[in-house]
Amino acid sequence: MLKTRIIPCVLLKNGQLVKSIEFKDFRTIGHLTSTMRIYNARNVDELIILDIDASKSGEIDFESIEDLAKECFMPLTIGGGIKTLEDIQKILNLGADKISINSKALEDMDFISKAANRFGSQCIVCSIDVKRKGGQFCVYDRGNLLEKSPLELALEYEKKGAGELLLTSVDFEGRAKGYDLELLKIFQNKLKIPLIINGGLSNPSDGVEALNLGADALAGAYIFHFSKYTPKDVKEELARQGFAVRLL
């Protein structure tokens, strides 16, 4: 049985690690080096870093990525601003284990296939941001709502060779009120690839609810920096509820 992963997912902005609320209202978490050391000490399963400056400017902060990778002793996923196979190669060469693509996948789905064929599906994470509009779930990209079904898009990504899906609820992101369970229900039992749910994790019980609706991994930021809970706390509750986790 595959073990459920607990994954801090934080943003890189101006050389600092930050968290946000609905992709705005940024709050600094800490310096790259010190934050990495905290994650290492807490034995988190993986770490996702999304470079939001690169997502806007297209200029990837390779220097910060290198600094992160040097201090990171867990599987590391890097996203933001990736446009070419050469970008992926450089990020992997700097020490990342996986890359996350969002806007580029929307623009050119064949890029997913090219990346998967060259580097292997196991290191290609496709990311979909979702926001509600009039009771419907829409794909959200760089401030725009797209008339696309998040589930249909995810299924297309899967066919193209994505190895995992990172699904983020923009409405719930940073709110610490639990995951968007209605969104998760749409995806329940629909994908063959692992689904990482992100946005809203506030306590271990939120994780239990998400896993019961088919999530394979739990991502979050607020809970691990601005609450009393640690990744170990979440894992211990999941283990009590019968989920397989990595406990040290």
Curated annotation (Swiss-Prot):
A GO biological-process term: L-histidine biosynthetic process
Principal subcellular localisation of the protein: cytoplasm
State a GO cellular component annotated for this protein: cytoplasm
Q: Name one Pfam family in it.
A: His_biosynth
Q: What is its EC number?
A: 4.3.2.10
Could you tell me the keywords of this UniProt record?
Amino-acid biosynthesis, Cytoplasm, Histidine biosynthesis, Lyase
Which InterPro entries does the UniProt entry name for this protein? Aldolase_TIM (IPR013785), Glycosyl_amidation-assoc_WbuZ (IPR020021), His_biosynth (IPR006062), HisF (IPR004651), IGPS_HisA/HisF (IPR050064), RibuloseP-bd_barrel (IPR011060)
Any single GO molecular-function term of the entry would be: imidazoleglycerol-phosphate synthase activity
User: Which reaction equation describes what this protein catalyses?
Assistant: 5-[(5-phospho-1-deoxy-D-ribulos-1-ylimino)methylamino]-1-(5-phospho-beta-D-ribosyl)imidazole-4-carboxamide + L-glutamine = D-erythro-1-(imidazol-4-yl)glycerol 3-phosphate + 5-amino-1-(5-phospho-beta-D-ribosyl)imidazole-4-carboxamide + L-glutamate + H(+)
Q: In which pathway does it act?
A: Amino-acid biosynthesis; L-histidine biosynthesis; L-histidine from 5-phospho-alpha-D-ribose 1-diphosphate: step 5/9
**Active site per the UniProt annotation:** 129
Q: Which NCBIfam families match?
A: WbuZ
Q: What does this protein do?
A: IGPS catalyzes the conversion of PRFAR and glutamine to IGP, AICAR and glutamate. The HisF subunit catalyzes the cyclization activity that produces IGP and AICAR from PRFAR using the ammonia provided by the HisH subunit.
Oligomeric state and partners? Heterodimer of HisH and HisF.
Q: What is this protein called?
A: Putative imidazole glycerol phosphate synthase subunit hisF2
Question: Could you tell me which species this protein originates from?
Answer: Campylobacter jejuni subsp. jejuni serotype O:23/36 (strain 81-176)
